[in-house]
Amino acid sequence: MNTSTSGKCPVMHGSMTTAERSVTEWWPNALNLDILHQHDTKPNPMGKDFDYREELKKLDVAALKKDLQALMTDSQDWWPADWGHYGGLMIRMAWHSAGSYRLFDGRGGGGTGNQRFAPLNSWPDNGNLDKARRLLWPIKKKYGNKLSWADLYILAGNVAYESMGLKTFGFAFGREDIWHPEKDVYWGSEKEWLAESVLRYANEEDPESLEAPLGAVHMGLIYVNPQGRDGKPDPLKSAHDVRVTFKRMAMNDEETAALTAGGHTVGKAHGNGLESNLSAPPEAADIEEQGFGWVNHKTRGVGRDTVTSGLEGAWTSKPTTFDMGYFDMLFGHEWELKKSPAGAWQWQPIDIKEEDMPVDVEDPSIRRMPIMTDADMAMKVDPIYREICERFRKDPEYFKDTFARAWFKLTHRDMGPKVRYVGPEVPAEDLIWQDPIPAGNTSYDVGAVKAKIAASGLSVSELVSTAWDSARTYRGSDMRGGANGARIRLAPQKDWVGNEPERLKKVLSMLEPIAKATGASLADVIVLAGNVGVEQAAKAAGFDIAVPFAPGRGDASAEQTDAESFEALEPLADAYRNFLKRDYELPPEELMLDRTQLMGLTGPEMTVLVGGMRVMGTNHGGTRHGVFTDREGALTNDFFVNLTDMGNSWVKNGGHYDVRDRKTGKTKWTATRVDLVFGSNSILRAYSEVYAQDDAKEKFVKDFVAAWTKVMNADRFDLKK
């Protein structure tokens, strides 16, 4: 027997799951469509028919909260609770789950249970939160499919606060779990954790120059460095960083101060040991660790000897009670810089009495020095934060209410409108950051509205473009935007360059009287106008088709609209209308994928929509780029037929491309990068070829209508209840 190959891997082609180069590594500049496929049903073990909202109806919320209350004080030997209470740990887990949200693109946040997966499960700032998740496993195991991890993380934080004396503002279930890491979230370009901040600031002296859409000063942090940016203590500089990072999470100064104080009223920081003694984070842990990271195999490493952030100590005298102790500690003492046992910078009081110190987490006969982070000291040295905190200190009830509301906002900001909330503790009060929309009318004559629109004299391009502009703001990351509410008629949307204000004003002046005369909301009329335009274009192509429509959208008022927060939804690029506000570092086709992913569309849906929008003449400003047809206004597959025709050649001409006849050299059309990518990228070309086929004319129309309807209804959560 020949044993020369003994010990070699029997799979001769090697491993495609570890070190082998992927397609994108071989060709790094190739357009990667993975973000459009990341939440396919294939990796989801629940199956296509699973309905979490239906499962929630079976959940015994009172029993669940009772179990969570019991968990808080059920200390486990493998990870003992500080002072016998897991509240601080659970709050940090919930906070860091929700706190990754950023306003710019709505990504991050606690709405998906993403903390279970890389990179978040192994971020330096999330150290030892794997222990919190494992402590929750018996409860998740007990309640099964009736309770998502995403809901459990946030509820555990809520119950932790309640168990320590805070009256919370409320809680909503409804967060659905994802089943693999998110590929669409840009966390930064750095290649190492906690890399120097110069890599994400255009100007280190200007906190506002933090790279968009990022919301943290370093790679691997939720907000700011507790020791000061780049580990250099400077409370005033930290104040600026805190202000910018919390603003990027849609928090104002008062909410920021309340969250900082309320978050550090309970629990402690851990740094009584050496970070070098810790093992790898969960994603890199040895297989026998079973997903446990930061394990200390060299010393005791738990209880009072835990190392997490490197800072060591509690902020208050009673770290398991929600009281006013944070303000008393911060403003009642002078502070000096010291190094923790782990070598981290922290602030300690100069003149504190022993009886005002918190007790040791294991031995109540021992007193320990309290601490403040650089961000805590910012609350004292920044004049705006100080004034707010002193106001809180004088009015405890106001502080508790402000914090409870800010905590609710923090933990629910990415859930979208209130109609998505489920459960017995949903607050009755409507909050402006929920983008409230009044109920719409469903009893009007839809046919009569469509007839009036058709008789208005508005063109297919005007009808379709306006409806598209109204709906395209939807983003599935935080469920904001969309056609419902007709906020396209309000500031700031009515003035966005991408919405062509003059054209928009003209179209709305024609549609508003129709809404008034028929009893329909303007939001419904705008969508119906787009549907009429699509139906007219389909008819011009030889197909009679009715675009599905569901009435019931409402019209939001200016008072119900936080104009500043809606600025983040402005489309700076929209490939569907061949619009680019200005040149960006990223190529237009990458921006197209980003918007497509936010809208919840697939690669084929993106393809059919772009092709249809081009032939209907919906380009921003009426440009001719990509209008590969002689029948503009008809919903034909001409875009794809001519894109894939080898009788044409494509020649760069300044900022665009000429489509020329190969034989004569005559320019037939012009195009942009987002037009040509559908013939250049191998995957998109495969989709384009499907729609270019001779037998695809009807399929193209039907697929366009289906994708169009998906966009128009993306924010109709009332239809999905």
Swiss-Prot record:
<keyword id="KW-0560">Oxidoreductase</keyword>
<keyword id="KW-0408">Iron</keyword>
<comment type="similarity">
    <text>Belongs to the peroxidase family. Peroxidase/catalase subfamily.</text>
</comment>
<keyword id="KW-0575">Peroxidase</keyword>
<dbReference type="GO" id="GO:0042744">
    <property type="term" value="P:hydrogen peroxide catabolic process"/>
</dbReference>
<feature type="active site" description="Proton acceptor">
    <location>
        <position position="96"/>
    </location>
</feature>
<dbReference type="InterPro" id="IPR010255">
    <property type="entry name" value="Haem_peroxidase_sf"/>
</dbReference>
<dbReference type="InterPro" id="IPR002016">
    <property type="entry name" value="Haem_peroxidase"/>
</dbReference>
<feature type="cross-link" description="Tryptophyl-tyrosyl-methioninium (Tyr-Met) (with W-95)">
    <location>
        <begin position="223"/>
        <end position="249"/>
    </location>
</feature>
<protein>
    <recommendedName>
        <fullName>Catalase-peroxidase</fullName>
        <ecNumber>1.11.1.21</ecNumber>
    </recommendedName>
</protein>
<keyword id="KW-0479">Metal-binding</keyword>
<dbReference type="GO" id="GO:0005829">
    <property type="term" value="C:cytosol"/>
</dbReference>
<dbReference type="InterPro" id="IPR000763">
    <property type="entry name" value="Catalase_peroxidase"/>
</dbReference>
<keyword id="KW-0376">Hydrogen peroxide</keyword>
<dbReference type="GO" id="GO:0046872">
    <property type="term" value="F:metal ion binding"/>
</dbReference>
<dbReference type="InterPro" id="IPR019794">
    <property type="entry name" value="Peroxidases_AS"/>
</dbReference>
<dbReference type="GO" id="GO:0020037">
    <property type="term" value="F:heme binding"/>
</dbReference>
<dbReference type="GO" id="GO:0070301">
    <property type="term" value="P:cellular response to hydrogen peroxide"/>
</dbReference>
<comment type="function">
    <text>Bifunctional enzyme with both catalase and broad-spectrum peroxidase activity.</text>
</comment>
<feature type="cross-link" description="Tryptophyl-tyrosyl-methioninium (Trp-Tyr) (with M-249)">
    <location>
        <begin position="95"/>
        <end position="223"/>
    </location>
</feature>
<comment type="subunit">
    <text>Homodimer or homotetramer.</text>
</comment>
<feature type="site" description="Transition state stabilizer">
    <location>
        <position position="92"/>
    </location>
</feature>
<feature type="binding site" description="axial binding residue">
    <location>
        <position position="264"/>
    </location>
    <ligand>
        <name>heme b</name>
    </ligand>
</feature>
<keyword id="KW-0349">Heme</keyword>
<dbReference type="GO" id="GO:0004096">
    <property type="term" value="F:catalase activity"/>
</dbReference>
<dbReference type="Pfam" id="PF00141">
    <property type="entry name" value="peroxidase"/>
</dbReference>
